Every structure is written in structure tokens, then in C-alpha cells.
Amino acid sequence: MTNCVPLSFVQSCVGHRGAARFFHSRLYKNRLDKDVYLCNNLINAYLETGDSVSARKVFDEMPLRNCVSWACIVSGYSRNGEHKEALVFLRDMVKEGIFSNQYAFVSVLRACQEIGSVGILFGRQIHGLMFKLSYAVDAVVSNVLISMYWKCIGSVGYALCAFGDIEVKNSVSWNSIISVYSQAGDQRSAFRIFSSMQYDGSRPTEYTFGSLVTTACSLTEPDVRLLEQIMCTIQKSGLLTDLFVGSGLVSAFAKSGSLSYARKVFNQMETRNAVTLNGLMVGLVRQKWGEEATKLFMDMNSMIDVSPESYVILLSSFPEYSLAEEVGLKKGREVHGHVITTGLVDFMVGIGNGLVNMYAKCGSIADARRVFYFMTDKDSVSWNSMITGLDQNGCFIEAVERYKSMRRHDILPGSFTLISSLSSCASLKWAKLGQQIHGESLKLGIDLNVSVSNALMTLYAETGYLNECRKIFSSMPEHDQVSWNSIIGALARSERSLPEAVVCFLNAQRAGQKLNRITFSSVLSAVSSLSFGELGKQIHGLALKNNIADEATTENALIACYGKCGEMDGCEKIFSRMAERRDNVTWNSMISGYIHNELLAKALDLVWFMLQTGQRLDSFMYATVLSAFASVATLERGMEVHACSVRACLESDVVVGSALVDMYSKCGRLDYALRFFNTMPVRNSYSWNSMISGYARHGQGEEALKLFETMKLDGQTPPDHVTFVGVLSACSHAGLLEEGFKHFESMSDSYGLAPRIEHFSCMADVLGRAGELDKLEDFIEKMPMKPNVLIWRTVLGACCRANGRKAELGKKAAEMLFQLEPENAVNYVLLGNMYAAGGRWEDLVKARKKMKDADVKKEAGYSWVTMKDGVHMFVAGDKSHPDADVIYKKLKELNRKMRDAGYVPQTGFALYDLEQENKEEILSYHSEKLAVAFVLAAQRSSTLPIRIMKNLRVCGDCHSAFKYISKIEGRQIILRDSNRFHHFQDGACSCSDFW
């Protein structure tokens, strides 16, 4: 038979369908189609060409079949991906008991391995049969068993059992089990087996060391010391110059960041290939050594055949150039030209992807778009590179549109694509689209790994969906550092979830999570908002323990925390240690701390120090300082800071401009605020809101509403919740009841803004000031949320102004206030005022007794004026001022002139059941009257407006007296109390007596 059909001819048919058919015809012609050996070769030849039908026909027509016949048909079908048919052959083979030698077992087990998890059922049965036939101890067969158990079901235990049954283990046996432990990430067991291998006398091969190197690199942070030990062992074995081993070591050292060792191995290698080059280049790029990676490529380009992957890595090096981004971009364009010339860009999708990625990272998004557009073939990486590049370059809308286009092309998004798309949605605050992407990913069965889940948490946190953020975090099987930072940061940004943020931080600690500066910054932000000073100190201690207390980000967060908790000594200690690390955030935090703790002199000293030492104040710092001066109505200091902002060329900045509008309106210079507002080149919501609130605060409700209409017509800035607080306040101060309800209803009807508690408070004030107490009571009962302290205090104040009418409603409001704020003296004073206004002196005595029993002290009322020589402060009946005699003399003169003009003291505001004469005397010495008398006595010939600030609300008698004084003296008086501004001129007030 062999003379008719030479063996060499039989072997030449493998892989050639035509030759196989010719061979088949020769068998028929020579009547050799029943020969088992030749038929087995024919089956193998057909299967090698993928012709399973012809192979099956030959197999079925064989009168006799041996184990090789079955092995050929099973392994061939499995190799061609026809696993179900291979499974059927396996069953038939087992039934017929065709197992004549160990080589048949090898073929069958490999087929089981290729079939996968289904084939493992038969693999186990065959394993059992091997025990009966004593083949389980054979190294060749058991080596395949080890591989099958690991690749099919990932079972280290079964693989180890198969390894243990081998009587005489060869190097393949040892390499197989070491490879299993390496892939399983069990570093200790892999090296324990390696030690046993050496003890057994087996010589390690290049594959042994390859697995060990892989094991050392499988850790999250590769063990450099372990790699060094492996390298020493490899040197002793003489395999360091081996191409496979050397390339693996270079890649391993490069991945671990130990580039000195990577270069050392690279230089010692006798031969190198593209894999070796790529491994070292990847390490250089990871360390952001773009120039070195480029130089290495240029040096090796003429010595080895570089692969297309080498060009992809080279392109990734250009964005990492340390000198200038433009240099890297220029080099990238040169390589782009080279790959076009060589034609690589036309048939290598990877190079096109590398070009898109390179241009995007170098900031040339237009070039990235161009490359992407002209790519004939695009895979998921192409789309991901483009979407990620758009997101990183701030083209968020286009990134989202590219994602939609990608889905229209039926390309499934990968993890990186989802992360970039969700990031763009978060930047755009497009929660709905983000939810759609989330839902589609779940529907498609895409694995939402830790990184994607983190991106989802960021999206929901940025768009205010805190509950969704919590759900994502809870559903994650594992959390990394970013996960904890995301949830803690999201909770810390929500006022209602601040305690939860602290609890979450503690849980992260208990879970053994490594904490970084972002974690500490977030939790310190929550602690500072809660004013938990002691907890802040404990977290400071943890930061020291974690060796990150000296990082600028952490120190800035600590300064902000200590400042808000009133621990300025702690702030100053940290600030003094940061001499070389201070940035704008540091200075801002320190100044804000001083301002928060009412240390305005120190805040201003720090500002002047910054200016003298050449520090540049940014817009937010100016805004912070201006806001502080606005809160205490220090006009002169505010104007000084304004001058500094002009010198710094920041006057036109929208943040500074808005702060200036707010400062001038709060300091009584509404004319300056309006003038500056009108000259602003750009306005944001803060600008409009400050001006509208300024009008409302100064009693110019009509002007506030006109400006609101202008804002709507402008169309650039939609009204927000703060805008409507100003609008409703304007209606309240101007007594515009119908207008108030119209704007209140328009919030939800026209702008989709759900009214908040502060808006309900404004409406309660509108009704209260209009004297509509019955409607006010009905309004409160129908509120969708429980009234808070501000609303009940508004109700009580309205009852005070009603001269005792609806006293029961006022009493109810007072009782609610005593429950909510039992230690606030204002609540007791308001109740007393209500009883006094109605002449209910016995109830007034009871209210004062209740206040005394609660050990609550009333805040002293005081007024102050700013003169050239400083600030002068006055309290009621005070005679400690150096010019007290002059002041009281002037006051008597004013009282006489006012009486002559028709002034009658409103003794109801004396709040005591005293004789009429005593009440009048008490009213005469209120702090604001002392202040105005002082200014009039000190500035006899001046015609400038008199500006007086008061910490409490002005009483009705002083309000009446100031109208008379303004007319008698011919001076405008501007009084700012705790509620609003009053402009007195020619016997009238800007509030039209509606206050």
C-alpha cells in the first residue's frame, strides 16, 4: 500500500483541499479506501482544510476504526469550532471504549478543553477512566489534564490533583502547574512550586521563568524586589540572554516602574525584537518620559523589524513630552507623515487609533477628528479614542453625539467609552441622557466594572441624584479608592447628607481602604460645614498618620475646616508651616477663616500683606473679601478693595463685578451698585440676583420687579431659586400682595422651579406685612412642608405689627419657636413685643419670666457710624462716649424741634408698663438716635447723607423720629437695620411706612 501511495504524498495533502480530494480519488482507484492508516490521514487532511463534511463521510465509511481515527475526528471538529458535533463523537467514542494508548487520551482531552465548560463533564469521566487504565500517572496525559481543568473551569484544586498523580514529572508538568498559579494570582504558591521543582532536580526552562515573571507582575503594584531575585536566578541558569525570557523581564521591570533594571536587561540581551522594544517603550511612556521613548525607537528602528504596535506606542509617547506640548505634536505629525508614506495607516486600524489618541491628548482635536473621519475601518477602540478625546478637550456635546453615532453603527461600547460618555453627561448636567446610557448598558449586558460604576456615581452626584449615587455604590461588588472618594464627595456636597459623609469615611477606614488627599479634603469639607471641631482634629491626626498632612490640598482643607470651626490658632499654625506651598486656595481659606470668625482687621491685614509681597489676588479672593465687608456694611474698606481690583484689571471679571454690586447695595450705596451693574460687560445669575435683592433691600420694590422683567427679556440668564427670593422680598417690602402671588405661582408654572421653604417664608411675609393674618394662617396650614423657624418668626412678627390682633396665632407661633429654638432670645422678645403692642402687660411679664427661666439673654441693640477717625458705636442710654455731653445736648435740641413740628413719641414701643414720661425718656435714648445726634453734632455744616447701621430691627418710634429729623436738619439719613435699608429724606421714608 505504501508503494502505491507514498507517505510523503499523504503528508503533503494536509492543508490543501484539492490535494486531499486528489488523494481521496487515488485511494478509491487503488482500492485503498478501507485502509485505516490512510483513511486517518485523509480525515486529518480534510479537517485541516475545514472540510468537515468530507471528513465525516470518510469516517462513516470506514469498516474499522482505531483510537487514532476517533482522535482525529474529535480534535478536528473541535479545532474547527464545531463543538457540539465533537461532543457527539466523544460520547460515541466512550461508548465503544476506544482507548488503546495515552496519545488517544491526549487528543480527546484537548478536544474537551477546546469545547469548554460542556466538555469538562466528559473530561472528568475520561479522567476517571484513566485511573482504571493506569494512565493517570503518565506525565504527557496529565499535563493536558492540568491545562484542561484550569482553562475550562478555572479550578486550581483539580489541576493540583492531576499534577500530584504524576509519578515522574517533566519540565512541562512543573511549568503547567506554575502557570496555573501564576494566572490565578497566587504568587506564594507559584514560587513554592518553583522551589519544589528545583529540589526535585528539574531544570527550569524559559517558560518556567516566563510564568514566574508574569506572577510577579500580576499584583496591583508589581514587586520589584521579587523581580530582582528572579533576575538573579535567571542569570545563574544562563537564560538571561534568551529572547523570550529577556523580553518578559524588560516588560515586567518597565511595568513596575523600575526602568533602570529594564534598561539593564535590555542592554544585556544579545538579540532583541519588537516585543522587547515595545515593553521598554511602554514603561518609558508610563513614566511620562516621552522624549526617551522616541529616542529609543529611533535608535532601534534600523536594528530590528519594528511592529505596527511599536508605532502605536511611539504615538502615545508624544503627549508625554516634558518640554512643550507643541514639540510632541510636531513629532507626532512627522510620524503621521511616515506611516502614510509606508501605507501602514491604510491597513492598520491600531495605528489610526493611535493617531486619534495622540492628537486628542496633544490638544489638537481638529486633527483627531480628521484622522477619525478618513479611517476606512473603525473598531470600538477607534470610537472610544475619539469620544475620550472630545471629552478631555471639553467638547462634551460632540462626545455625546459621537456616542449616539457609535450605537447607530451597532458597535457595543466598552468600559472606556462608557466612562467618557458619562463624564461628558456629568459635565453638561445631562442626567436623563446619562440614565439612558446606564439603562442601555444594563440591557446589553455590558459589564459595569468598578471604573464605570465610579463614572456613574460621579454623574449622579454632579446632577443631584444622590439616591441613585447611593444605589450604585451599594450594588458594587467591590470598591476602590475612587469609589469611596466619589460617594464621600457626593455626600459632603449635600447639606442634608453631611453626617452620612463622615460615617462613610469611617466605613472606608474600617474596610482597610487606603485614603488619599481627595478623601481627606471631602470629609474635612463635611466636618467644617457641621462645625465639628474635635472631629476635625481627629481627622487631622489620621492625615498625619497616613503621611499626607503635608500635602497642600490636605493643608488647605484643614485650614478651611479649622476656620469654620472657630479654631483660628490651628489655621495660623498650618498656614505658617506652608510658607513654600501656599497657593490661591490657601490664601482664600485663611482670609475666609478670619472673615467667618469676624476678625475683619486680620483678614484685611492679610490682603494688604499679599499685595505688598507681590501675591496676585484672584477673582474669588476679591469676591470673598468684598462679601465680608458687605456683611458688616464697611463701605470705605469695600471701596479700598474695589480700587485694588481695578489695579489688578479684575473689575470687568463677572465674579468680582457681581460681588461689587452686592457690596455696594448692602453698604447703602444703591446708586454705586446700579452704576456698576449697568457697566458690566457680562452678567451672571449672581449679578442679576444681587441687583434685584439690592432694590428689594432698599425698599424699591417696583424697580426690583422692572429689573426682573429686563432679566427675562435679556434671555441670557434664566431665573433661579435665588432670583425669586429677591423678587418675592421686593413684593414683601413694597406691599405688593397680588404681584407676590403671581410671581410665586410662576415659579413652577413658567420655570419648572419647585418653591422651597425660603419662598414660602417670603410669601408669609407678604401676607403678614399686608395685614392679611387670616390668609396667612390658611397659607401656613396648606404648605407642602412643615414651617421652619423663619416662617414661624415671620408669623409672630406679623402679629406684633397688628397691635395684638390674632394674638392666639402669635402665641402658637411663639410656642413652635420655643420648641425649635429654645435658646434664641429673639423669639421671647417678639412675643413680648406682641403683648406690649396690645397692652397685655400681664402676659408681657409672663413672657419675660419665661425668658428668665430659660436663662436666655436678649442681644443688646447697638448702632454704629463710620467717620474719618474710625467707627463709633452706641448702645441705648450709653454715656461712655467721649462726646456724650455734646450728643445728649444735641438730642434734647432735636426732641424739642421735633415736638414743635408735631412729633408725638410712640410710647407703645417702650415695652414697659411705666408712666408716660418714663416711656418717652426710654425712647429718646435708643442707640440709633444717639448715633444720628453724634453725626449732626460733629458735622454741623455738612450736607452729605448720614449712614447709620443697626444690628436689630428699628422700632416704630425711631422710624417716625428719623423722618422728622431728616426734614428739620435738611439731611438724608440712610439707616440699615437687620431687615432692610430706610432712606429718610424731607420727612418721608423710602419704605412708605410699610416695613
Curated annotation (Swiss-Prot):
Belongs to the PPR family. PCMP-H subfamily. It comes from Arabidopsis thaliana. Keywords: Repeat. GO terms for biological process: RNA modification. The keyword Calcium does not apply. Residues 869-899 are annotated as: Type E(+) motif. Residues 791-868 are annotated as: Type E motif. Coiled coil: none annotated. PPR repeats lie at residues 35-65, 66-100, 101-137, 138-169, 170-204, 205-241, 242-276, 278-303, 307-342, 348-378, 379-413, 414-448, 449-483, 484-515, 516-550, 551-581, 583-617, 618-652, 653-683, 684-718, 720-750, 756-786. InterPro entries: DYW_dom (IPR032867), E_motif (IPR046848), Eplus_motif (IPR046849), Pentatricopeptide_rpt (IPR002885), PPR_At4g14850-like_plant (IPR046960), TPR-like_helical_dom_sf (IPR011990). This is Putative pentatricopeptide repeat-containing protein At5g09950. Residues 900-995 are annotated as: Type DYW motif. One of its GO terms (molecular function) is zinc ion binding. It holds the Pfam family PPR. Gene3D superfamilies: Tetratricopeptide repeat domain. It comes from the Eukaryota.
